[in-house]
Amino acid sequence: EGYDTNLIGNGTDATVVEADEFDRSFLHLHPNIACLISDDADHLDIYGTNDAIKSSFAEFAAKISDKNTLFIAQGIENINGTEVSVNGTAVINAYNLRFENGKRVFDLDFKGEKITNIKLLMPGEHNVLNASLAFAMAKTYGLSNEEIKSGLDSFKGIRRRFSYKINTEKLVMIDDYAHH
């Protein structure tokens, strides 16, 4: 939110892409670091079967040679990577979820390292999972815990993904292009 563009560049050698499986276009990417949030039966009009979707995700995951740089939400089966969970048992696990001063706050067990008081402006346990996956990728890229926490704390979300249009005591209107 607030950038008025879908591409932000500052001359670094990193590019962050939200890849969509809709038309199999994500199979044209060759990432060094990636995450898989879900392999649900979606876009059956394109894939035909759930098995075809899962095969596509497996093909994408196979492009990442170092499985230490592939992060997957706990529960995704038959793909090797580092599991991430919320209140789960993964090696990277968000826990102690709470609200403080209108923000979602949580702690993260990152492979035995306890990282506390990670703050998000966005509600929802699914956003804690998204933030945990983003944290794992950013840390793997070399950012410090404090740099990542600062970035998450200031991230306003993506336009039309649970965007408040009206937020008063009497009326709340949310624009959410929820296609899943």
Per-region residue spans from a language model:
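Flexible active-site lid/hinge loop adjacent to a nucleotide/diphosphate
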Residues: Y3-E77, L121
